[in-house]
Regions:
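Catalytic cores and adjacent flexible loops of soluble metabolic enzymes
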Residues: 1-220
Length: 221
C-alpha cells in the first residue's frame, strides 16, 4: 500500500494465506508467525476473519496480545455481526487495531452472490465503515472483485467509505483476472474519478493465478 511516497506492507498470511488447501493454523501458530512478521518490520498483520470460527476469533485475540509494533487487522463482511465480532476480537490488542470490511462491486458478484442493487451496495459500505469507525484505530474498506467492476461505481463506493471514516481503500484483483498494466490503468482511473482518495491510503491486493503476482504489485505501486 502506498500513501504519497510511503509504501506500507499489509501481510495477510494469517487470513488469506490460511485459505490454501490443507492449511489450518492454531492460535499459537498464528502468534509464532505474527512475531516473525513483526521482526521483519511488517506494518499491518491481518490476523483472521473473526466471525468465521471460534479458532479464528481466538487467533486474532492472541496475535493482538503478542505483537505491539504492527497494526493488527480483522476481516469482516458488512454485516453487523461480522463487524462487532471483529471489534471484540481486537479489544485487548497491545498496538493499533484495524477492521477490514469488504463488499463486492462487480456486476456478476452483486447479482449472483449478493443479490443486491448498486445503491444497496453503496449503503452497505457506508454502514460498515460508520459502524466501526471510532471503535478501532483504523478502518480499511475493500471493493471485492474491483478489477471487474465499473470504475465509476468503484469511485462512488470509495467516496462513500472515505466520507464514513475509512482510512485505507483496497482495490483487489480478487479472481486474478487482470494483467499488471490493466490493473494499474484501473487504479489511475478510479483515482481520477475519486479525488477523495487523496485523504486515504490506497491499497492493492494481487493474486498469482497467472503467475504474475509480484509483477502486478510492482506495476500497481
Amino acid at each position: 500500500m502506498a500513501h504519497g511516497r510511503r509504501i506500507t506492507i499489509f501481510d495477510t498470511t494469517l487470513r488469506d494465506g490460511e485459505q490454501s488447501p490443507g492449511i489450518a493454523l492454531s492460535p499459537d501458530e498464528k502468534v509464532e508467525i505474527a512475531i516473525a512478521l513483526e521482526r521483519l518490520g511488517v506494518d499491518v498483520i491481518e490476523a483472521g476473519f473473526a466471525i468465521s470460527s471460534p479458532g479464528d476469533f481466538e487467533g486474532i485475540r492472541a496475535v493482538g496480545a503478542a505483537v505491539s509494533a504492527p497494526t493488527v487487522a480483522a476481516l469482516a463482511r458488512t454485516r453487523v455481526e461480522d463487524l462487532d465480532a471483529a471489534v471484540e476480537a481486537l479489544a485487548s490488542a497491545r498496538g493499533r487495531t484495524r477492521v477490514h470490511s469488504f463488499i463486492a462491486t462487480s456486476p456478476i458478484h452483486m447479482e449472483r452472490k449478493l443479490g443486491l442493487e448498486p445503491p444497496e451496495v453503496v449503503e452497505q459500505a457506508r454502514f460498515a465503515v460508520s459502524h466501526v469507525a471510532g471503535r478501532v484505530d483504523e478502518v480499511e474498506f475493500s471493493c471485492e472483485d474491483a478489477t471487474r467492476s465499473d470504475p465509476a461505481f468503484v469511485a462512488e463506493v470509495c467516496r462513500t467509505a472515505i466520507e464514513a471514516g475509512a482510512t485505507t481503500i483496497n482495490l483487489p484483483d480478487t479472481v486474478g483476472y487482470s494483467l499488471p498494466d490493466e490493473h494499474a490503468a484501473f487504479l489511475l482511473e478510479v483515482r481520477r474519478l475519486c479525488p477523495e482518495l487523496e485523504r486515504a491510503t490506497l491499497s492493492v491486493h494481487c493474486h498469482n493465478d497467472l503467475e504474475i503476482g509480484r509483477a502486478s504489485c510492482r506495476e500497481r505501486v
